[in-house]
Amino acid sequence: MTDYKDTLNLPQTDFPMRANLPEREPQTLARWQTLDLYRKIRKDREGQPKFILHDGPPYANGRAHLGTAFNKTLKDIVVKSKTLSGFDAPFVPGWDCHGLPIELNVEKKLGKDKLSANAFRQACRDYAFSQIELQRDDFQRLGVLGDWQHPYLTMDFGYEADTVRALAKIVANGHLLRGQKPVHWCAACGSALAEAEVEYRDKASPAVDVGFEAVDAEAVRQRFGVKNATTRVLVPIWTTTPWTLPANEAVSVHPELHYALVKSELQNQPVYLILAKDLVDSAMQRYGVDDYEVHGNLKGDALEGMQLQHPFLDRIVPIILGEHVTTEAGTGNVHTAPAHGLEDYFVAEKYNLPINNPVDARGRFIPDTFLVGGQPVFKANEPIIVLLADSGHLLHSETIQHSYPHCWRHKTPLIFRATPQWFIGMNKNGLRERALAEIEKVTWLPAWGEARIGKMVADRPDWCISRQRLWGIPIPLFIHKKSGELHPKSPALMEKVAQLIEKESVDAWFDLDPKVLLGDDADHYEKVTDVLDVWFDSGVTHFCVLEKRRELKVPADIYLEGSDQHRGWFQSSLLTSLAIRDKAPYKSVLTYGFVVDSQGRKMSKSLGNVILPADVVKNLGADVLRLWAASMDYTVEVNVSDEILKRASDAYRRIRNTARFLLSNLYDFDPKKDKVAVDQLVALDRWAIFTTQKLQEKIITAYDRYRFPAIYQAIHNFCTVEMGSFYLDIIKDRLYTSKESGLPRRSAQTALYYIAEAFVRWIAPIISFTADEIWQFMPGDREPSVFLTQWFSDFPNAALSGEEEQRWQLLLQIRDEVNKALETYRNEGKIGSALAAEVVLYADERLNAAIATLGEELRFVLITSEASVLPFNEKSKAAFDTALPGLALEINVSEFEKCARCWQRRSSVGQIKEHADLCDRCVSNAFEDGEMRQFA
């Protein structure tokens, strides 16, 4: 048999079938760096409309984990898609560099006491730099394009100085206040914590009912209408923090709740109890009392001012009114310790009660505290409970499990502790109302984010922005020693401090002699040594970065972070921006769910489910990780596992194989010379171009709406359905067997060229390394990188009428039914390949109209050696119905010889003496002018 291989146009390409991403991606990275790609993009997009995605700074501590890898990948997808849309979309990465975790690492390594404060801060700075280098390498290895040589760092002298300037504006605008307020306090940190640094965990706590005895029992009984009695009156409170009882200054009742006087016997003595009417039964059940009488009924406001004896201190405390009292649990009477609770503080403030804080910064009672002096607060619970039991004031005690605030770093329980702190006042100058109004103007993605952050802002307390740490940006203020007032020239003085910090670092403030700035006034003022909450540091990036860097702008078009940032960076950015310039720093905010394993569990070493991005990149490649990120529904928790990543790897392989097919059939195609005009295209090729163009519109819209899973699905379906199992399959015969430069082949190549030009751009934001690798093998003159282009727009006008479009949709369905039938025949051993079959289609009028025009070329669509169409009502006995209404099939095994070149079984094989093993079509294609195709 003659070998006709040289007469075929077999696919050729140097684009490798095996991706080998772990080795090939670093080569692409090196090329990008040699090319200075990021700078080239900036120059290319100069003068175009700006699109700013502002990078929320990750903490400079440890290698990138899967959550931060997911974060940076989504951001990179957005930035690259906007670049392809023609925007100037710079990406300036940043790092959050101050704060406790860095302090703890340095302390562990070097010891805090061995270093001066300045040396300790320098060690923290050095440590942060080392961590930034690690993370920068991780993010670049993921293919994230950005200004990695000029990131913003919250510890840069310039940034620290601008943070002071931001605070100065907030001071000048009247939003800063100082107060002895209770704040979340971590004894291990020795500092106040922000709301965003608090996490809730289950904790076992003692729950006790404690009786406060009425000083004038007779007057109380009379208020309830009980006369001629001598029994004592107790007001029971219920608390899970007995250790706060030494700081008790009042008992709160709700002014509108109804309270009952309950007569009973407790500890073998008659007693009257004042309880919220709705809680009488549950309280008495808790006290183990079945026999009791309810006497009288008063609203809470009638109890105001009643005096009670503290259960173990020589202190008389009043009953006061508080709207925070509920009947969800307890007694309706709330133990009020203004130093240890925000609601307690606010209600006590109305009554001008003292703020008695007996707990020091280490979480221990001060030495002269009765009974528990020097003890850690949680250990003080036991002796207090014993004392209450011995004195007859303990009505009930049990241990309960409940959700309790913990330090995000130490995982230890927090306390509320009143200390002198600096706050941004939520109700000062209408900040809360303006924040809520501004939230409504922002686009929140998903939409439920608006309600979430709105509720948080509506309910949040004043923001405590001061910390008692070494490593941080100072709050450079002077307070008058007698009046406690800020220096009247504070904003101007802060600018002078900012100028010093810009040159010398934050040490300039801590080393500063107040006389340098204040002169003789220095004796009257105290220098503040607190530092700023790190959420303030990162919260003013809109001022220190967006407003300061020439290539950026404020407001940013989008902030994109995890959903936990509704209470973190989104809030701190919003509040500081409003306090500075009275508008939000962002136009839209996109959030995503936490990255968890396939069972919805957080990544944990103890569970053994931790997947490191570095390992994924090393084993599968960054593009597989990026494809996984794009495929996930980020509006909920994001699942990852080895199996899920394997599926992403399989999907990647399909995309790569599609690209390889396109490239391998364009090896001899010069778009300048070989493109076929649209009016000369084979109909199937025109359909393919039209389908590609339509899909591109959907893909660009999905990119614009940040619907990445929809893009992934669209590309996956395009590779597997429209292209893989239909179009590319059909045109193989034409590509390989038609005349090399003939119209049928050049028509198919023209379509493949347009598809490749569009396709490589679609995938570029997601699998960036692979897209740029494909780009190097594309035909024609082009830019050195796909990222220096825009979405492909040079499509010919290949629009189809609605009728034509419908016809091709029906052909897809018909071919699907034929394929299923042929597969059955293959499985039964009746045929080896589809080309061994001859198919008769019995079609109703609707289907007949779709396929009749194809005539002889129908067999190319079905990839059979013969295909004919007959009316549906002429079905033979051998025909069988399909799942498509109006279509029946009859499949016969061809009796003809197989063509040695195209493998089709045709009656013309053996009829041409010079080429007895070829069909007439192959003789024409190989040795004559070549066949013509109109439809397929």
UniProtKB/Swiss-Prot annotation:
Its catalytic activity? tRNA(Ile) + L-isoleucine + ATP = L-isoleucyl-tRNA(Ile) + AMP + diphosphate
Magnesium among keywords: no
Please list every transmembrane segment annotated in the UniProt record, as residue ranges: none
Residues engaged in binding Zn(2+): C899, C902, C919, C922
Q: Which residues form a coiled coil?
A: none
- Return one GO MF term: aminoacyl-tRNA deacylase activity
Positions of short motif 'HIGH' region: 58-68
- NCBIfam families hit by this protein: ileS
Q: What is known of its domains?
A: IleRS has two distinct active sites: one for aminoacylation and one for editing. The misactivated valine is translocated from the active site to the editing site, which sterically excludes the correctly activated isoleucine. The single editing site contains two valyl binding pockets, one specific for each substrate (Val-AMP or Val-tRNA(Ile)).
Quaternary structure, from the entry: Monomer.
* UniProt-recorded name of the protein: Isoleucine--tRNA ligase
Query: What is the organism of origin for this protein?
Result: Coxiella burnetii (strain CbuK_Q154)
